[in-house]
Design a protein with these regions (language model features):
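Short, compositionally biased P/S/T/A/G/V-rich stretches that sit at domain boundaries
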Residues: 1-23
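Short amphipathic, basic-aromatic surface patches that mediate peripheral association
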Residues: 33-46
């Protein structure tokens, strides 16, 4: 995870879930985040509670950052692939609520 940002009492406590649907040759991933605002403008700058960006991983490999709640994932080879998203602060620390990283995963099965 690297550096973390433990959410303090009274601060927004982000939650996350994922959904995925076929889209063309690939997939449309929807990130459903509560108490969290995606912000490209402040990425790499100062921390604002409840604000930041996501990191997306497929099969444990980081694909990049998410600055909005939807992303297209290109075609995947046959098999089952785990897609994971973490929520991170503007200054790139991983959000942690009650000792647990704010992350969600979903599997994509390609026949």
């Amino acid at each position: 995870l690297g550096e973390i940002c433990a959410v303090g009492e009274g601060e927004p406590a982000p939650e996350i879930s994922l959904s995925v649907a076929p889209e063309g040759e690939g997939w449309r991933l929807q990130v459903n985040a509560e108490d969290f605002q995606f912000s490209k403008e402040l990425a790499g700058l100062y921390h604002v509670p409840g604000m930041g960006h996501g990191h997306i991983y497929v099969g444990g490999v980081k694909l990049g950052r998410l600055y909005e709640p939807e992303v297209h994932i290109g075609a995947l080879p046959q098999g089952t692939h785990e897609v994971r998203v973490t929520l991170n602060t503007n200054d790139h620390r991983a959000y942690v609520v009650d000792g647990t990283p704010v992350t969600a995963a979903i599997s994509i099965k390609v026949d």
